[in-house]
Regions:
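Conserved NTP/Mg2+-binding pocket subregion across the NTase superfamily
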Residues: 1-80
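Charge-rich, acidic-biased intrinsically disordered regions
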Residues: 112-130, 166-180, 212
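Acidic catalytic cores of enzymes that act on phosphate-bearing nucleotides/polynucleotides
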Residues: 72, 99-107
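Small-residue-rich helix-loop
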Residues: 95, 109, 113-127, 149-159
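Short amphipathic alpha-helical interaction elements located at domain edges
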Residues: 181-235
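Solenoid-repeat scaffolds in large eukaryotic assemblies
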Residues: 86-88, 232
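Long, low-complexity C-terminal extensions of enzymes
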Residues: 135-181
């Protein structure tokens, strides 16, 4: 399982998570566990289930960029110059990136391509996207279905307060990257504050809250996640 993650341990930093491959992580966290009396295997799987939010957003931004480049830009240009091969490659890239974006927004790891469409059909919020992808694959109203797929992704971006844009997917990608930068910076500040807080010596002894990082981090996130980068960087 750890080999599937690309490490001999569970990634424990944003930098390590950045180099994990979602298809491998999908293999690691799916499937039935028939026996794990020690709980070791289950514990590792649970820790691999959710990646840091800034990494999720950066991976999402990458797929949104691909959607814009392949579906909203390359495909119509290829059709305009009567280049069916280039159009085919653009559509293939668009379908893959839109389905991967749907998985990321659903907090799921996208599986390998042979299972990607079936997995997308099972995502609760992306019925319209799955239908649009099928229609594109069958050559039906391609331009219209590209925009239907984009609209489905944009709707969930708005629901998760990642982007409110109705523009090209590249604009949504920029919004996702900006949000990732805010979260990464906030998490660095929270970690530094906790380190200082942990070392405080009180006259009456160590306070209970000094051993409760979970509550401490939630309180700080509720504050810092609402700030813009310039304000965070001024701390």
């Amino acid at each position: 399982m750890l080999f599937r993650s690309g490490f001999d341990h569970v990634p424990n930093s944003s930098e390590e998570w950045q180099y994990t491959v979602d298809e491998n992580l999908a293999c690691a966290v799916n499937g039935s566990i028939f026996m794990d009396n020690s709980g070791f295997f289950t514990n590792i799987r649970q820790r691999l289930q959710v990646q840091p939010e800034d990494i999720r957003l950066r991976k999402l931004a990458a797929e949104l960029e691909k959607m814009a480049q392949s579906g909203q830009y390359n495909y119509p240009r290829a059709m305009k110059r009567t280049d069916p091969a280039a159009a085919f490659f653009a559509l293939s890239a668009f379908m893959e990136s839109s389905m991967k974006a749907a998985h990321i927004l659903s907090q799921k790891y996208a599986p390998y391509s042979k299972w990607l469409f079936r997995s997308t059909e099972a995502l609760p919020k992306f019925d319209e996207l799955a239908i649009a992808v099928r229609n594109i694959a069958e050559g039906k109203n391609i331009t219209e279905n590209i925009e239907i797929a984009c609209a489905a992704v944009r709707a969930e971006l708005k629901a998760q307060q990642i982007s409110n844009s109705d523009d090209y997917m590249s604009v949504c990608a920029d919004d996702a990257k900006h949000r990732a930068d805010i979260i990464y910076t906030a998490e660095e500040i929270i970690a530094m504050e906790w380190d200082f807080f942990d070392k405080v010596q009180n006259e009456g002894g160590r306070a209970d809250c000094q051993d409760d990082y979970y509550t401490f981090s939630i309180m700080r996130r509720s504050q810092y996640y609402c700030w813009e980068l310039p304000m965070l960087c001024s701390l």
